[in-house]
């Protein structure tokens, strides 16, 4: 419902009688008479979204707690209400990556992505919350049940929408109210209403169902006493799953794999390097159910994936079978941080982290022809890459297609794909097919990739849940003279760095000893703080203390010096 930020009007307080009526209605709809508003003041405003209009109710701190669509009586709680009252709604568990990669990107929860057993209250049409198995009491999405979930004992092989998502954490509703509350990830061994049991901790079977790979595995059972430990660390089944996925990736996507290859080389240089972005101290062959590399490889030889030679632990992989259904249906994933991305961050961190400043990373996402090039070198076409990643991909493509000029290794003879990518915006029919290697990357990035940026705090945590489209924005500071010879300094475009306008205005009142006002910037269509007097440098110093480096701040002084007579 809130894929984009809705337009909202000014908030107004509800009358006491309306407040009581609203509470009674919601208690009746949720069959929860214990629920109550945490503040005595409740506000309301109308919203106008992309596909719906309605009313939002907030507490006295302007935190949205309920909303409903126009001409409909159904009230939906927000995730913030569920954080205050964990037992407010029945909860459907799913996997963390399903929430991050799918639900937060606008998808509904499929039955194959959910974790049974289900709450008996989760009948068709029931309002429910969605939580991850790592934090089973922290609701991250709200939705309506579309299937009779209690009737499902297993979800492997099942299809259909389990829950239609209405609202989720950090969606347009959260953004329009500028919410900064973070989920209270409390890991507990048992839910307050005993509706979330230890059996809901996922098995490797259910993860594979999300990936649509149907394999016969043993379900992992976990005692109640072990749940806290399981929630803090990967289970053996989880480790088995990740190592198995790395094997599938190696057999289907790893161009560097050359057979025959020794077992130790196969594990260290291929399996471990083809893991998703997880801690290798937590996920390795020693922590699997096989314990040893030899047992792991012999298991998959028995399953028909590999062909081995040797005895005992001295094994050599001499063949592979890519006709297995699991490999045919395998969907590649983003590998752990690439060397170039890590180096980019480390080089930036070394310069900026020491001073406690934020730092940024420029990323690129392919479209059209770029996807074709990445497929040729077996890279995913739906993820983000650094410029160094793309440079390496282009070099690999040139090598695979034998495009290097035999007379001059510093030049490339472009094939049709590379030629179209480089000359996409040039309407030159007879352009040369020969180009210097160093001249390929810039037009290729400009023509075929969308630029994104991600900002990291000084402690290396992400400022945004996902990279933001476009180039890194700059804060604008202007000192000028208004009519009446009144000098002011304006600051704008700071909200992207999670600087609150009201907090900034309050700080500048103290620092600059002058009055401040908050208005809307005509240039950036965002909040603008104005303070009396020429305080450009003082504002820059304050922003530096907030972790924003000076190179991200543009200061313009429009005050003209008086000419001497």
From Swiss-Prot:
SUPFAM superfamilies the UniProt entry points to: eIF1-like (SSF55159), PUA domain-like (SSF88697), SWIB/MDM2 domain (SSF47592)
GO MF annotations in UniProt: RNA binding; translation initiation factor activity
Lineage, top ranks: Eukaryota, Fungi, Dikarya, Ascomycota, Saccharomycotina
Gene3D superfamilies (UniProt xref): 3.10.400.20, SUI1-like domain, SWIB/MDM2 domain
Protein family (similarity comment): Belongs to the eIF2D family.
One GO BP: formation of translation preinitiation complex
Every SUI1 domain range: 475-547
UniProt protein name: Translation machinery-associated protein 64
Gene, per the UniProt record: TMA64
InterPro entries (UniProt xref): EIF2D, eIF2D_SUI1, Pre-PUA, PUA-like_sf, PUA_eIF2d-like, SUI1, SUI1_dom_sf, SWIB_MDM2_dom_sf
Domain (PUA): residue spans on this chain: 89-170
Segments forming domain SWIB/MDM2: 362-447
Subunit text: Interacts with the 40S ribosomal subunit.
Domain remark text: The PUA and the SUI1 domains may be involved in RNA binding.
Disulfide feature: none
Additional information: Present with 3870 molecules/cell in log phase SD medium.
Domain of life: Eukaryota
């Amino acid at each position: 419902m809130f894929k984009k930020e809705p337009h909202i009007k000014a908030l107004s307080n509800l009358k006491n009688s309306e407040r009581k009526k609203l509470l009674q209605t919601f208690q009746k709809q949720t069959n929860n008479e214990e629920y109550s508003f945490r503040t005595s003041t409740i506000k309301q405003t109308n919203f106008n979204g992309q596909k719906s209009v309605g009313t939002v109710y907030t507490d006295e701190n302007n935190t949205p707690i309920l909303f409903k669509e126009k001409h409909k009586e159904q009230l939906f709680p927000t995730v913030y209400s569920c954080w205050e009252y964990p037992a407010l709604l029945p909860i459907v568990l799913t996997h963390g990556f399903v929430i991050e990669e799918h639900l937060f990107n606008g998808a509904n929860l499929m039955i194959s992505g959910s974790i049974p057993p289900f709450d008996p209250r989760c009948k068709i049409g029931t309002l429910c919350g969605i939580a991850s198995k790592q934090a089973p009491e922290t609701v991250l999405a709200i939705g309506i049940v579309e299937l009779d979930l209690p009737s499902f004992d297993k979800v492997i092989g099942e299809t259909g929408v389990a829950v239609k998502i209405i609202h989720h954490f950090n969606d347009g509703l959260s953004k329009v109210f500028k919410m900064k509350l973070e989920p209270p990830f409390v890991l507990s061994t048992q839910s307050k209403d005993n509706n979330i049991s230890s059996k809901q901790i996922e098995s490797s079977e259910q993860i594979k169902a999300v990936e649509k790979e149907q394999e016969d595995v043993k379900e992992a059972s976990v005692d109640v006493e072990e749940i806290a430990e399981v929630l803090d660390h990967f289970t053996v089944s989880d480790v088995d799953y990740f190592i198995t996925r790395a094997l599938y990736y190696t057999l289907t996507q790893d161009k560097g794999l050359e057979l025959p290859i020794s077992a130790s080389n196969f594990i260290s240089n291929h399996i471990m390097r083809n893991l998703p972005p997880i801690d290798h101290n937590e996920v390795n062959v020693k922590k699997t159910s096989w314990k040893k590399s030899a047992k792991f490889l012999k298991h998959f030889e028995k399953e028909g994936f590999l062909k081995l030679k040797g005895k005992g632990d001295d094994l050599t992989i001499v063949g592979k079978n890519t006709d297995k259904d699991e490999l045919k249906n395998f969907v590649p994933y983003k590998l752990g941080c690439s060397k170039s991305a890590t180096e980019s961050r480390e080089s930036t961190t070394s310069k900026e982290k020491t001073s406690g400043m934020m730092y940024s990373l420029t990323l690129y996402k392919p479209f059209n022809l770029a996807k074709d090039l990445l497929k040729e070198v077996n890279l995913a076409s739906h993820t983000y890459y650094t410029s160094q990643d793309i440079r390496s991909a282009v070099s690999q493509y040139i090598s695979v297609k034998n495009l290097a000029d035999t007379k001059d290794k510093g030049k490339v003879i472009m094939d049709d794909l590379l030629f179209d990518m480089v000359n996409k915006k040039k309407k030159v029919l007879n352009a040369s097919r020969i180009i210097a290697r160093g001249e390929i990357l810039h037009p290729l990035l400009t023509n075929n990739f969308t630029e994104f940026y991600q900002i990291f705090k000084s402690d290396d945590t992400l400022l945004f849940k996902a990279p933001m489209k476009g180039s890194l924005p700059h804060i604008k500071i202007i000192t000028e003279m208004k009519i009446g010879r009144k000098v002011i300094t304006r600051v704008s475009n700071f909200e992207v760095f999670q600087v609150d306008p009201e907090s900034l205005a309050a700080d500048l009142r103290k620092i600059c000893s002058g009055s401040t006002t908050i208005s809307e910037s005509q240039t950036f269509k965002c909040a603008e703080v104005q303070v009396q007097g020429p305080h450009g440098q003082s504002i820059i110093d304050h922003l530096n203390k907030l972790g924003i480096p000076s190179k991200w701040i543009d200061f313009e002084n429009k005050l003209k010096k008086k000419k001497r007579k």
